[in-house]
């Protein structure tokens, strides 16, 4: 037998979120919401996971997706010339992790973890409304691919 495999899906899809804008109930789902108190609200976010454990080895992969959304702020001519639009693209990233547990005796062990976040170095979508025309920190991480190594000693 290969081991134990677990598959998972955690998803949310907002159908509607109305707030008062100038006295009128307005649905703000799928918008960046630069001109009201609501935060940016993509319609859908999800995480797909796959984990495999076999003896001292375990591995996991996570696919993270944020749907596209848009800003209602008009794009200036200078911003449009730089390629900005009202659209904020969707983003999909993959995180990978591998663990190996070294057993020293019946009570002590050492776990080695190797990880990669954003394994394919996906760039965040640009947002015209964001500070300095950058990105939306509520839904996107601009740091690119990150590699990690961890050790955990249990005694």
Segments (PLM) and residue ranges:
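Gram-negative outer-membrane beta-barrel transporters
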Residues: 1-73
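Residues that define the transmembrane beta-barrel architecture of outer-membrane proteins
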Residues: 42-46, 90-94, 108, 143-147
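Membrane-embedded beta-strands of outer-membrane beta-barrel proteins
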Residues: 48-50, 96-98, 149-151
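Generic long, charged, amphipathic alpha-helical segments
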Residues: 63, 72-97
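C-terminal beta-signal and adjacent terminal beta-strands/loops
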Residues: 63-75, 101-155
